[in-house]
């Protein structure tokens, strides 16, 4: 019974997941690494941010624990400027 109640609570309350990735603009272009990368990630709900090399994009801002509503780099989509 406890498992069923716990499952029901999770479904009712909802659980927002988090993920790591290169934060992007709506057009799937990365934010290039700037001194404020950590602040950018935190402002968008992440726990931290750092500079990392991304092939094809250069030095980009990598965020940890971003919420699902913040876009991250989709490798199957191109950056459209």
Curated annotation (Swiss-Prot):
GO terms for biological process: defense response. Has the structural arrangement of an alpha-helix connected to antiparallel beta-sheets by disulfide bonds (CS-alpha/beta). One of its GO terms (cellular component) is extracellular region. This is Alpha-toxin Ac1. Expressed by the venom gland. GO terms for molecular function: sodium channel inhibitor activity; toxin activity. Gene3D superfamilies: Knottin, scorpion toxin-like. Its main location: secreted. Residues 1-17 form the signal peptide. Residues 19-80 form the LCN-type CS-alpha/beta domain. Keywords: Disulfide bond, Ion channel impairing toxin, Neurotoxin, Secreted, Signal, Toxin, Voltage-gated sodium channel impairing toxin. InterPro entries: LCN-type_CS_alpha_beta_dom, Scorpion_toxin-like, Scorpion_toxin-like_sf, Scorpion_toxinL, Scorpion_toxinL/defensin. Alpha toxins bind voltage-independently at site-3 of sodium channels (Nav) and inhibit the inactivation of the activated channels, thereby blocking neuronal transmission. Disulfide bonds join 29-79, 33-51, 37-61, 41-63. Belongs to the long (4 C-C) scorpion toxin superfamily. Sodium channel inhibitor family. Alpha subfamily. It is found in: Secreted.
């Amino acid at each position: 019974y406890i498992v069923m109640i716990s499952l029901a609570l999770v479904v009712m309350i909802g659980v927002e997941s988090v993920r790591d990735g290169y934060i992007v603009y709506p057009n799937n272009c990365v934010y290039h690494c700037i001194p404020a990368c950590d602040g950018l990630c935190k402002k968008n709900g992440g726990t931290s941010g750092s500079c990392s090399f991304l092939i094809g994009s250069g030095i980009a801002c990598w965020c940890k624990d971003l919420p699902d509503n913040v876009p991250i780099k989709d490798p199957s989509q191109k950056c459209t400027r």
